């Protein structure tokens, strides 16, 4: 299976507010940059959308390393998701899972791949994360004011 590294980030001007997402996909010597935005969203939704759009771009099952500065994404997919699914998309205290639509989409898109999820400290000079951050900000700017 092909190995792919994904660096993802989300940004929001206001929370909720104008948001953007960015992702860098690296497979060997090939790289792809992606970004987009939404007019009324949250930082967590943009963090998730970055990974969703990156996984959507993969055309076949891959071994994937995802690097995100969002503990919400990293812990959500690695730790919390199985419990949410078992409880019918409810949290441990029986409340509806926030962003369940995106969690369900992310769960579906992750299935064909062997994914390892890695948290990196944001704005700490990590080159892949810095590129994803710049793309996410381009996504915000693409929405206008």
UniProtKB/Swiss-Prot annotation:
Monomer. Its cofactor is Mg(2+). Signal peptide: none annotated. Gene3D superfamilies: Ribonuclease H-like superfamily/Ribonuclease H (3.30.420.10). The keyword Nuclease applies. Belongs to the RNase H family. One of its GO terms (cellular component) is cytoplasm. It catalyses: Endonucleolytic cleavage to 5'-phosphomonoester. SUPFAM superfamilies: Ribonuclease H-like. It comes from Cupriavidus necator (strain ATCC 17699 / DSM 428 / KCTC 22496 / NCIMB 10442 / H16 / Stanier 337) (Ralstonia eutropha). Keywords: Cytoplasm, Endonuclease, Hydrolase, Magnesium, Metal-binding, Nuclease. Residues 1-141 form the RNase H type-1 domain. Endonuclease that specifically degrades the RNA of RNA-DNA hybrids. Mg(2+) 1 binds at residues 9, 47, 69. It is found in: Cytoplasm. Mg(2+) 2 binds at residues 9, 133. This is Ribonuclease H.
């Amino acid at each position: 299976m092909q190995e792919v590294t994904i660096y993802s980030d989300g940004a929001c001007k206001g929370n909720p507010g104008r948001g953007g997402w960015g992702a860098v996909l690296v497979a060997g010597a090939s790289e792809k940059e992606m970004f987009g935005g939404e007019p009324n969203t949250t930082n967590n939704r943009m963090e998730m959308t970055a990974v969703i759009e990156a996984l959507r771009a993969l055309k076949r099952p891959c071994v994937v390393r995802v690097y995100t500065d969002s503990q919400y994404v990293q812990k959500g997919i690695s730790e919390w998701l199985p419990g949410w699914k078992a409880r019918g998309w409810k949290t441990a205290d029986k409340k509806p899972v926030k962003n369940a639509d995106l969690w369900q989409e992310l769960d579906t898109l992750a299935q064909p791949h062997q994914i390892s999820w890695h948290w990196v400290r944001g704005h700490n000079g990590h080159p892949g994360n810095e590129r994803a951050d710049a793309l996410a900000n381009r996504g915000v700017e693409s929405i206008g004011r």
